[in-house]
């Protein structure tokens, strides 16, 4: 949805600032003034995300898309016969009652003069809101399910609103789209396998209670209060029957006025925010026409951060509908960066009390494939737990090859059941960087691939499904939702278009080049095979088998058996554990990534088996309290049969 100050056009710039300055292994990204959540949603693929906004309707959008890692099941609704909640909410019949707040106050019903919605659409919105409240009160939907359905409604409302852009005023005649019927569309939910968290608090109060690695700050720039422009979305979200006033039916918002919109308060508020920020890396988006001057922001950042790390990036832009072209050309969007002298959040724990030395470098190569369950965020905890010297390293469930590419071994064998992924990696291994980049850029030009050309994307997807050329798959992924790959039961690529988010950006190109260059320097053999068919007899006591199988007690597209590839079940788990026992009897090293518990479930089979070996607890996700774990988090572990770790 359109939102004042949206950073959709600056996502690549933000990414590049992070790439240039964040050289350590950051895990936790916080978007403190999230709005509709476009920034947090974009970086959800790379980090555990904390998001916050003081507006409740924004908070609902965040909770639905950031905190949810999948589309909810609505199991309780199904028990009462409602299998498709959206269809029910769109089509169920109702009668207008005195409870229908929008109908009575924002549509031409019973003499009301306001024309924000037609009576048909206003009453449908009222029916949906009352129904969602009832379902929630009757425990038919939980908090995340409520947020998901309400977020869908909030995102649908602007398409049938009789406004020019914001809700500061309604049109005096009916716009064509306002006469259309309210349509509810499912949300695209990305899964990063982290316990993401959303907040609905004042930023300056919240900053004293949270911590992480990267803090992104995008405060209001001027005296314009967002609440007045989006008062109707706030009322729909809260549905609290406010005492409205004025011609446009504003809700009271004196207490909601942001300090960042007040000239006398903004300096102190920003200074407090930076001073209290318990984050190592801080990025600030601002504008040259904002209340704070560039020099003021620089001074505050340097007073609380490391002055030598200060950076400013200026992006010129044309002021929307400006009549003063010269003045508009001098406007800039800023991104400020500073580093604070604060440690990162990551740590390694071992129940055997084995001292783990720091790995030689904090810089790890990242796979260009956004593979579900990828271990890039855990590399700084996993790699130091590998033996000092490895002859042959077997990456038995290699996936996107995040682990194997970062291991020092005389020989690396990477196996995976997904033929298409193996072919992409093998092609990159056998092809020069120049040829790979040239191929990608040819396809981009040929199909007109961009963040907005969905038709070009679909045409290219159809072409790939007919030809199955490996580098075309990678190119396709670059323009797909969340940069992920997904196949149906016919093994056809079916991931949707990543509108306004995904593209082969300079930052992505840089990552790809680094990965291929590292790949060419290693002695790697890629093999498409099921794990039990690997020839383990070729291994001896100087070798290491690393296993990152699908997790038995979690669900994902990689282990549900519904994507044209073999599923993962208890029998598969037993086979793998038997193989590892056999390797141990031969004196061959192994390391197994897995989870002992997840969202209240325990892998009892693994818990019992692991007692024979060394269990190292990894910090997979982070709470915002003084404790390391919270209810519902995954207990991520690395299980090894050796103790001679990298020093």
From Swiss-Prot:
It is an enzyme of class 2 (transferase). The keyword Methyltransferase applies. Pfam families: MethyltransfD12 (PF02086). A motif (Adenine-specific methylase 2) lies at residues 548-551. Keywords: DNA-binding, Methyltransferase, Repeat, Restriction system, S-adenosyl-L-methionine, Transferase. One of its GO terms (biological process) is mismatch repair. Transmembrane segments: none annotated. It catalyses: a 2'-deoxyadenosine in DNA + S-adenosyl-L-methionine = an N(6)-methyl-2'-deoxyadenosine in DNA + S-adenosyl-L-homocysteine + H(+). One of its GO terms (molecular function) is S-adenosyl-L-methionine binding. The keyword DNA-binding applies. Its EC number is 2.1.1.72. InterPro entries: Ade-mod_methylase_MStsI, Ade_MeTrfase_dom_2, DNA_methylase_N6_adenine_CS, MeTrfase_D12, SAM-dependent_MTases_sf. A motif (Adenine-specific methylase 1) lies at residues 218-221. Monomer. The 2 adenine-specific methylase motifs of the protein participate in modification of the two strands; the first motif modifies the sequence 5'-GGATG-3', the second motif modifies the sequence 5'-CATCC-5'. PANTHER family: DNA ADENINE METHYLASE. Belongs to the N(4)/N(6)-methyltransferase family. This is Type II methyltransferase M.FokI. The lineage of its organism: Bacteria, Bacillati, Bacillota, Bacilli, Bacillales. The gene is fokIM.
